[in-house]
Amino acid sequence: MHSPPRDQAAIMLWKLVENVKYEDIYEDRHDGVPSHSSRLSQLGSVSQGPYSSAPPLSHTPSSDFQPPYFPPPYQPLPYHQSQDPYSHVNDPYSLNPLHQPQQHPWGQRQRQEVGSEAGSLLPQPRAALPQLSGLDPRRDYHSVRRPDVLLHSAHHGLDAGMGDSLSLHGLGHPGMEDVQSVEDANNSGMNLLDQSVIKKVPVPPKSVTSLMMNKDGFLGGMSVNTGEVFCSVPGRLSLLSSTSKYKVTVGEVQRRLSPPECLNASLLGGVLRRAKSKNGGRSLRERLEKIGLNLPAGRRKAANVTLLTSLVEGEAVHLARDFGYICETEFPAKAVSEYLNRQHTDPSDLHSRKNMLLATKQLCKEFTDLLAQDRTPIGNSRPSPILEPGIQSCLTHFSLITHGFGAPAICAALTALQNYLTEALKGMDKMFLNNTTNRHTSGEGPGSKTGDKEEKHRK
């Protein structure tokens, strides 16, 4: 206990202040309102008054009043207003300088908030505060203050020298580099979860499961059996009495997803005759991912949709085979050739017309032989190419966009044309014989000059 004041009036005023203080504290305790910071500010103003020589607040109260209890760090008295509230800035586990929502002014209100936050954080051990780590993704990055804001805030009401303590090197905060990297990542399009521990990994520009397949059968860096059956699809063009199913291989599905068509989930589901459902596209993508094929959502088709797009390769080849059979057996090549030959009965034109028919027949044969050497993969077959890569790539493009129907169909049509040319040449030979017979009967036989010229020209 300190010695009592000399002045009697000072003693009475001091006791009056003590009684008022304890009455207010007693009422606050009964009301359940914590008022530590407000009481401390009043005590600070009293201690700095003209009666600063009064003894500290260690007076023993009467039995009606309980001594006040101040939780740490306010327990050691007296309270000094000049205490540095920013001494914890260099603490890497403190979030106070980084989580102040206001930039300025740094007034009395912020000093009280800093004191209240420090009172709730300092008594706790650092091991119990894992959420304060700078590497934790649950931090509120949107309210984090940047270093430039901290540096500029030194000019708004801070004490002398306080700006130096808030510099980037003085903070030493392990989360500042993380905040910078997170903001840069957000600007570049990568998203991070703010309120979850799980982070989203940025998707590379080229997916690992690329749709292009090399010659060794490796798809997207992984070995895929392209001859494996993916599903069986009922035919679209068959009648009810002769419905057949066609096996769709993994290689065929890969060809539908690759250029030139690049089908999306909706069109691929139509090709595979999958029923429309709410989650049909997602289930199809999940099934394709199991075999190493990637079908991104929201994909746009690259080629125009035709009737051939809806056919699987087995049915398209079946259609081309039936078309070729009909062209071979049912095309009226003889009737067409006879009709056209009757329009060219001039004996002077027979020789030139026959030469044109022979040249056309030779050109069709060359073109048919080229198409017959096409080695585009169809179904589960992967024949070795025999043509040059330049021409083979063009034939492959045509075959892929027609699902294997194009080249066989053209060959079938050329077969019908070849049959017509053959019948036309036979008709031309008959016309030559008829003309020769007519010349013999008219005195223009082989012994005559005209007959000798025609015979020599025919040879």
Swiss-Prot record:
Gene Ontology cellular-component annotations: nucleus
Record GO biological process: aorta morphogenesis; collecting duct development; distal tubule development; ductus arteriosus closure; fat cell differentiation; forelimb morphogenesis; gene expression; glucose metabolic process
Sites of the Glycyl lysine isopeptide (Lys-Gly) (interchain with G-Cter in SUMO) crosslink: K21
Positions with biased composition (Low complexity): 121-132
Residues covered by region (Disordered): 30-139, 435-459
Biased composition annotated in UniProt, kind: Basic and acidic residues: 450-459
InterPro entries: TF_AP2, TF_AP2_beta, TF_AP2_C
Keyword annotations of the record: Activator, DNA-binding, Isopeptide bond, Nucleus, Phosphoprotein, Transcription, Transcription regulation, Ubl conjugation
Bias type Polar residues, positions: 35-51
Leader sequence segment: none
Modifications made to the protein after synthesis: Sumoylated. Sumoylated on Lys-21; which inhibits transcriptional activity.
Tissue distribution: Localizes to neurons in areas of the cerebral cortex, cerebellum and hypothalamus (at protein level).
Lineage: superkingdom: Eukaryota
Pfam families in the cross-refs: TF_AP-2
Induction comment from the UniProt entry of this chain: During retinoic acid-mediated differentiation. Up-regulated by starvation and a high fat diet.
An example molecular function term from Gene Ontology annotations: RNA polymerase II cis-regulatory region sequence-specific DNA binding
Entry's transmembrane regions: none
Region H-S-H (helix-span-helix), dimerization: start-end pairs: 299-429
Family: Belongs to the AP-2 family.
Purpose of the protein: Sequence-specific DNA-binding protein that interacts with inducible viral and cellular enhancer elements to regulate transcription of selected genes. AP-2 factors bind to the consensus sequence 5'-GCCNNNGGC-3' and activate genes involved in a large spectrum of important biological functions including proper eye, face, body wall, limb and neural tube development. They also suppress a number of genes including MCAM/MUC18, C/EBP alpha and MYC. AP-2-beta appears to be required for normal face and limb development and for proper terminal differentiation and function of renal tubular epithelia.
PANTHER family linked to this entry: TRANSCRIPTION FACTOR AP-2 (PTHR10812), TRANSCRIPTION FACTOR AP-2-BETA (PTHR10812:SF14)
Subunit structure: Binds DNA as a dimer. Can form homodimers or heterodimers with other AP-2 family members. Interacts with CITED4. Interacts with UBE2I. Interacts with KCTD1; this interaction represses transcription activation. Interacts with CITED2 (via C-terminus); the interaction stimulates TFAP2B-transcriptional activity.
Protein name: Transcription factor AP-2-beta
